[in-house]
Amino acid sequence: MDERDMVKRVKVFASSELKLNILLCLKYREMDVNDLQGVLGGRNTTILHAIRDMTDDYLISRGRQGYRLTNLGKIRGCVLESLMGVLDDLEARPDFWLNHDISSIPPEMLERLSMLRRSEMVSTNPASPLEIHERLESLLSTSKKISAILPLLIFPKDSKVFTNALRRGSRVDLLMTEKIAGSLLDDGSISAYEVERLLKFESFRLRLIGEDLKLALFVTESFLYLGLYRHDGVYDVGTGAIYLGESAVAWGMELFEYYAQRSRELDEGDLTRVFRSSIQPEAEAPPLAGEDPGAFDVMIVEDDLGHATLIRRIFEESSPRWRVHHASQLQDALRWIEESYGRPFLVVADYLLPDGCGLDLAGKAERPLEVGFPLIILTGFGSEKIAAQAFKSGAMDYVVKEADSIQRLPEIAEEALLRWRELKRRAAGGEGHPSPQEGQGLPLKV
């Protein structure tokens, strides 16, 4: 039978809603015509006619207590239920599957998406783009077994998610890409020695894979978390799916094992060698349009470590030219600005900080050039009053902490730098107010 004939047969069978319902009703127990009528409604004669057709197709046979499925009927019922499960999941969250890159999910795993029927979808709150990761971290804090695939740093580098799990006796099987393994050492926040300490736990396994994976996966004894990259190549930090139940966990473990078999396990002896080779500098990327060659310093002034990590990652993933720094307090930022005098930089500062306001960095300035550097203000809530205050204090831009706006920060920074250079050009040509030296503005009011 060729494919066209098979399509015709499937179409004939699928076109009968009654036959499909009979197949599902008989999947778990024998039923007579009256039982089927009680569940499905309709006339006995109509049900009997459908049963006759299904008997001729060897899908149904007579049993002691009524009608039952043959082996062919049971197989077709399982296929039907699987198809319904896939359609149910796709219809429940079409945006999740439509707007993300699923190339790292093998075709055989996509065929078994019906295993994810029992699920809960957690989407970001626009005012809290890290809500999904906070929820994930909370669930992991009580998990006894964690198998994870990390193509990027989901949590802050100083997060204790895995360390705490090992200390309470949980098993942790961690699979990382070579790229993320190298980034663990890039700023000294974690060292090979510290990872070696984790490897001393018998319940900890560390694997490395050279493929560029486009998914993040966490599987525990009770749930599965799946995070995907958008089609533009950026990981979607604001949206993920949490699936509950044994079937979903089984699907997640199959996906984990698929990549675990393609990875290599590390021990204490080869850990340092692997990390050193993974962080060899890559070829310098060409400068962005309108930019001078070389790196550009960006200071993130943010007391929320999770938000700061997210913003750092967005900048670093957008271009290797961004050299990102972080300060959690105003005084630390002021000290860095003073030390950076004489070289160009940009500051992205939260409006509310533990020891002041992000606008305090502008001092007594009323115009951008009087600030002495491009300043972008972040806030967790939109306010026309704050926006007006920001611009009156010389800020180049004002950004509300919403998922889309945070993702666009590198683009917003580029636009701010272009406007900043244009302001300096005009000032140098006598078209505007005099320009202070780069990094030197009016006295700060802290």
From Swiss-Prot:
Q: What is the lineage of its organism?
A: Archaea, Methanobacteriati, Methanobacteriota, Stenosarchaea group, Methanomicrobia
For the modification 4-aspartylphosphate, the affected residues are: 350
- Role: Member of the two-component regulatory system FilI/FilRs, which is involved in the regulation of methanogenesis. Regulates its own expression, expression of the filI-filR2 operon, and of genes involved in methanogenesis such as acs1, acs4 and mtrABC. Acts by binding to the promoters.
Query: What is the designated name of this protein?
Result: Methanogenesis regulatory protein FilR1
- Cellular component, GO, one term: cytosol
Q: Which organism is it from?
A: Methanothrix harundinacea (strain 6Ac) (Methanosaeta harundinacea)
Pfam family membership, one: Response_reg
Q: Which GO terms describe its molecular function?
A: phosphorelay response regulator activity; transcription cis-regulatory region binding
List the CDD domains: REC (cd00156)
Q: Which residues form the Response regulatory domain?
A: 297-416
Q: Which InterPro entries match?
A: CheY-like_superfamily, FilR1_middle_dom, Sig_transdc_resp-reg_receiver, WalR-like, WH_DNA-bd_sf
